[in-house]
Amino acid sequence: MLKRTGQSWRVLLLLGAMAWLPTAVLAEPARWNVDPEHSTIEFRVTHMVVSKTTGRFMDYAGFVDMDAEAGTVKAIEATIKTGSVNTNHEKRDAHLRSADFLDVEHYPTITFKMKSYKKTAEGYTAVGDLTLRGVTKEITLVGQYNGATKDPWGNTRAGFSAEGKLNRKDFGMVWNKTLDSGGLVVGDEVQIRLDIECIKAKS
């Protein structure tokens, strides 16, 4: 009887350990907040066929929920203030804020919410919903997770880079003018470049 009881206890302990094991292995993702002082949200668009114009958004916030050790991401969300657009040209920036383009009076923010994340041999692919001028479209970001490190002030930081593209006409930005050569002043495709640094939230 004692021997059988001892065996039963060993079985119960083994089952308990097996039930606990997945929880121990699959760590809960941590919240990492975007540090705008060390991040860049940049876009490029063809200008008059022969060159590119580059701009940035200066006011934004966001977060990444991830397990940094495993490099797995559960969520990415971001909000960008459209009025913060900056192409280093005041007149052009005013035009971009107008109803011809971003229409900041009626649509003060751009939002992104991740739907799926896949690790690849080259880095990762993140697919999500981008909402701009009241229109929501799916876009794909392809990039790299650059790892995590401690800064001199005790914060843990992680870095991401990514690129994507969209067609501005999909979001109602159809303004253009035709050149004498037959080309257009502004290209339809907008290239996106992100360099994002995040700080791990204190637990």
Predicted feature descriptions by range:
Residues 2-13:
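Bacterial N-terminal signal peptides that target proteins for export
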Residues 11-22:
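Bacterial N-terminal signal peptides
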Residues 25-203:
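Low-complexity, acidic/polar, glycine-enriched regions of mature
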